[in-house]
Amino acid sequence: IMESIYTKGRDNARTPMQWDDSVNAGFTTGIPWMEVNPNYTEINAEKALENENSVFYYYQKLIQLRKEYDIFAEGDFRLLLEEDENIFAYVREYQGKQMLVVANFTENTVPCTLLKEWQDGEVLICNYSEDGEEGMLRPYESAIYLCGF
């Protein structure tokens, strides 16, 4: 099936950029040759800029963290939990310091033994604002922990 998708193009994975909730999502005043996603009135760049918890601002925080901490780009990388189908996790180590990145890619709360090992680490960023149950990752939760800083 993937072969047929590649030979027919990538249009099935694209839609016009959703800038705002105006006609055609603010993408064009003309007639777009690709259909605008019907959710453009609720999901668009303008609304993201109005929400301090949006993906836009989360990415800005991540970019700032990368500028502040060399460990984001330097040091050794070690993949963890390679057999776990729910959790993606890795550690970076640089100059005696460690960073754990952990993400739950499911809609379910899942146990994560790594969190107990890192409970004394500093939570640098998390996409949930309140603490969750110890040793558990909530649906689609991601976090970065620092140790040794």
Locate predicted features.
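Solvent-exposed beta-hairpin/edge-strand motifs
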Residues: 115-128
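Short, surface-exposed beta-strand/loop "edge" segments at domain boundaries and coil↔beta transitions
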Residues: 97-98, 130-134
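Surface-exposed beta-strand/loop patches in extracellular or lumenal glycoproteins
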Residues: 105-118
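Loop/helix patches that line or flank the sugar-binding groove of alpha-linked glycan CAZymes
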Residues: 1-99, 107-110
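Residues that form or immediately flank small-molecule/cofactor binding pockets and catalytic motifs
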Residues: 22, 128-129
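Ordered hydrophobic segments in well-structured contexts
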Residues: 87-89, 97-103, 125, 141-146
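C-terminal beta-strand-rich structural cap/linker in extracellular carbohydrate-active enzymes
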Residues: 133-149
